[in-house]
Design a protein with these regions (language model features):
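N-terminal leader/targeting and pre-domain segments
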Residues: 1-358
């Protein structure tokens, strides 16, 4: 036992074919499966046992094929879960895999994934309930999908954290989220060859989304559409930083629509967000808008507390629609509500916007 865990220790082993570990469990306590510094020529498949909590350690491992890690579920005829395996933590720093990485963790205990300095030659598909995905400095040659980050209601755990800072992604990046907890996405100095799309639905008093992509380079377009579903009036909202980022395609923020507690698709008056994008470079249009199809009155328009585009170079047009400008910034940056000094764009238009300062 180590930290109340029992170990299945396969550290530093060499396997000429495939390695499959399924339904292993500890008699007392959690099970830690150790494959650090191992060398497997083929695929690796790890499946947690039902009713068992498992920890997976793949640090410095070398895998010649695909890596698959999953939690099993047993359902009754009505689709209700009868038994569920749990993977609490996956440590895979410096992992080298010649194939794809697939992680499926649907159980609602929030798995922690550490993927620092990893090298994945194929795609990475990360589905399920994560506490955090820490993949800074990693290189993934294929597409990356992070999906269904559902959190339990009234969860005491902190915000979901997704980090690809200073990483390299050879295709597109898609992050989908929904649930009660706020989410923070870090793309500091990341290099993504394809499109980046961050989307989903959040609900609850603490739900908000924060995106940091300062100095990032995106070879395609960037789309941010994470709509809070408000159940209580709060001062929380969305913060987006794109300072000195380079986007070869277009930038789209919104529609910023939200669902009220009764389920109606109406703009939430308490929803606010801020865009800090000094020195931003885009090859296409920049569109910032709430859902103009709803036709909500101006007092219901989403608050845009800061729009800072000083020194930006927009290759297309700037289009801002259905937002309400206010000066109630939560962040102290010494900037006005709208600041576009020395910015360049093909055209700039503000449609159905209102100003509420002071």
């Amino acid at each position: 036992p180590e930290d109340a865990r029992q170990q299945f220790d396969l550290s530093s082993i060499s396997v000429q074919g495939e390695l499959q570990i399924e339904s292993c469990f500890a008699i007392n306590g959690d099970l830690a499966v150790r494959l650090d510094r191992s060398q497997i020529a083929g695929d690796v498949s790890l499946v947690a046992a039902s009713t068992q909590t498992m920890h997976v350690i793949l640090n410095d491992a070398r895998v010649g094929g695909n890596v698959r890690i999953s939690e099993p579920q047993t359902h009754n005829r009505d689709g209700e879960i009868l038994q569920q395996g749990f993977i609490h933590q996956i440590q895979a720093s410096n992992l080298r895999a010649d194939g794809d990485l697939t992680i499926n963790v649907p159980a609602n205990i929030r798995t922690a994934l550490v993927l620092l300095h990893a090298r994945i030659e194929g795609a990475a598909r990360l589905y399920g309930v994560f506490q955090y995905v820490s993949a800074a400095y990693s290189k993934i040659n294929g597409a990356v999908q992070v999906g269904n980050l559902t959190q339990a209601e009234a969860s005491p755990l902190p915000a979901v954290f997704v980090d690809f800072s200073e990483g390299v992604i050879g295709a597109s990046l898609f992050v989908e989220t929904k649930g009660e907890q706020p989410i923070t996405v870090h793309l500091y100095s990341a290099n993504v060859s394809g499109n980046v799309r961050l989307f989903g639905q959040l609900k609850g008093a603490n739900a908000d989304a924060t995106v940091f992509a300062n100095s990032a380079h995106i070879g395609g377009s960037l789309e941010i559409d994470v709509a809070p579903i408000r159940t209580l009036a709060t001062e929380r909202g969305r913060r987006i930083e794109l300072i000195h980022a380079v986007i070869d395609g277009a930038l789209s923020i919104g529609p910023q629509s939200a669902l009220r507690s009764d389920g109606s698709n109406t703009l939430a008056a308490d929803h606010c967000f801020e865009v800090l994008a000094w020195g931003l470079r885009t090859g296409g249009d920049v569109a910032i808008r709430s859902d103009h199809r709803l036709g909500a009155p101006s007092r219901e328009n989403v608050e845009l507390r800061v729009l800072a585009l000083d020194g930006a170079r927009i290759g297309g047009d700037l289009d801002v629609r259905y937002v309400r400008f206010t000066s109630l910034s939560r962040w102290s940056y010494g900037t006005s509500t709208v600041s576009m000094r020395h910015a360049h764009a093909g055209a700039a238009q503000f449609v159905h916007c209102t100003v509420d300062i002071g």
